[in-house]
Amino acid sequence: MASLQISGSVKFEPFVGFNRIRHFRPIASLGFPRFRRRFSIGRSLLLRRSSSFSGDSRESDEERFITDAERDGSGSVLGFQLTPPGDQQTVSTSTGEITHHEEKKEAIDQIVMADFGVPGNRAVEEGAAEVGIPSGKAEVVNNLVFVTSEAAPYSKTGGLGDVCGSLPIALAGRGHRVMVISPRYLNGTAADKNYARAKDLGIRVTVNCFGGSQEVSFYHEYRDGVDWVFVDHKSYHRPGNPYGDSKGAFGDNQFRFTLLCHAACEAPLVLPLGGFTYGEKSLFLVNDWHAGLVPILLAAKYRPYGVYKDARSILIIHNLAHQGVEPAATYTNLGLPSEWYGAVGWVFPTWARTHALDTGEAVNVLKGAIVTSDRIITVSQGYAWEITTVEGGYGLQDLLSSRKSVINGITNGINVDEWNPSTDEHIPFHYSADDVSEKIKCKMALQKELGLPIRPECPMIGFIGRLDYQKGIDLIQTAGPDLMVDDIQFVMLGSGDPKYESWMRSMEETYRDKFRGWVGFNVPISHRITAGCDILLMPSRFEPCGLNQLYAMRYGTIPVVHGTGGLRDTVENFNPYAEGGAGTGTGWVFTPLSKDSMVSALRLAAATYREYKQSWEGLMRRGMTRNYSWENAAVQYEQVFQWVFMDPPYVS
């Protein structure tokens, strides 16, 4: 009979002929209510405890969950190993204790572990080199569990989806075991086919939140070395994007993402992916507020009972402006003990309250994640500093400042295979840093496609992004008449605020030979604009990282950006006099954020394009040879992984 064994100490035996969900009663010492956990794995499983003495096996028929007796030498729960039918050989799946070589530990200890988020500090990037981490494989491998509301190509609305679709693959390539957990969105469109290869694992988990028992199931696809796990529930099956539709944000988003977080905490314990679970010694990487309940649950509902005591959590902040704030009365919906309200409790300032009797009390999930996570990563070094300021902290600056010693900034990477001008299937001509002669043909093809006069000598400026206040679209609107006086062409691609969409259409009607606006988003045209334009404009008010400037530099298109967040970190301001007149830099960084400073930077860039071709080619090649691959970012993440296990986990 096929059996499920755990390192010789615990054995699962299937009941022959049964195919129903079986309820397991957790052991009393864990303190969980009886209805807390329920799952099925195809046939029902009977858990028998067995121990070996002098070759004899003794079994107890008591049905139970794993106790301390079934842990390895470090105290971690052993993973589940599926034994092939007819083969009763025991296979050990102990995770083992993560250790560090003494010489590496000494090197790590020499790193100054403070103020990593301050702009200009390269501790994270240099740390990997200091301890001699190999470029191909990680020195210490981990069980990594990404929890996210979106992951490309399955679901994507912005940079978050790009990060969670690419970084896990890079880390898996370096030897880590990686799981990505996100909802299984079905909205009745062609995008549903993205989940076609994901198979139902036949496992059901029941969790307690929102005043009752909620059952979810799991789908799984193994791709590019990563376990892609999708939490399935009817609340994820509706038209629109992951967060809302044309009418606005979904009213039950708190429920939908609370469900995701509870399921994510259970997944490493119950999903036998590849034959065995990830187990308790997992490192959770939770992304933005949607996954922010995970570190709170680990601290409030698991560690007090000895579960996940060896796990750690890292909060990755992609955009601090979104915090998951809901009325205080919704706290009981989160499935947390009553005494943990202080972790997520939040009070709005007086000026933000709606009426005189409004106390301002609310629940802030991201605040709770900041309090309980073991370490915090932002998507650029500049943003790590900005979130501790009044201007960039969105009310959380004091809390973040108090945790400054555990905040690290790591710049996002890009998919260098998808964004490669020498092989890009979306552009008509290919080129590289060694030979950029075909780029001008991409420009002429774009002018023809958009119906603009074909003028290869005319500087062409592009903008790709959301049409909203954060992206500085109002600044472009104000500067439009001034820019149209110059001998330039301007192309914009994006959607968002209807008033800016209307403005784009009116600009195109007024300046038929100079301006084109494409309302919406189209992947092929975004590639062609990136390749065909000479300059890419990004006047964002704040930009945690930004990806378009990285794509632009990869394609030899010069970025002109506002000096904020990741834009300031990744674009080096052009200096034509450095290096004996050879010049340094990859673009123009303007500040302050004003129409005059932006127009001035654009005019400097256009003049350089027209009059100083050698300097322009230097700008192009320096940008094209920069390394912004995910493999480079993965090495920096590994340094933080080592640091997070040096300290005990958050408990209370």
UniProtKB/Swiss-Prot annotation:
Pathway(s) it belongs to: Glycan biosynthesis; starch biosynthesis
Gene Ontology, cellular component aspect: amyloplast; chloroplast; chloroplast stroma; plastid
Phylogenetic lineage: Eukaryota, Viridiplantae, Streptophyta, Embryophyta, Tracheophyta
Protein name: Starch synthase 1, chloroplastic/amyloplastic
Inducers of expression: Circadian-regulation with the lowest levels at the end of the dark period.
Tissue expression summary: Expressed in roots, leaves, stems, buds and flowers.
PANTHER family: ALPHA AMYLASE DOMAIN-CONTAINING PROTEIN (PTHR45825:SF11), GRANULE-BOUND STARCH SYNTHASE 1, CHLOROPLASTIC/AMYLOPLASTIC (PTHR45825)
Matches recorded under NCBIfam families: glgA
Organism: Arabidopsis thaliana (Mouse-ear cress)
Gene: SS1
Plastid found in the keyword field: yes
Function: Involved in the synthesis of short glycan chains within amylopectin in leaves. Is required to generate chains up to about a degree of polymerization of 10 (DP10).
InterPro entries documented for this protein: Glyco_trans_1, GS/SS, Starch_synth_cat_dom
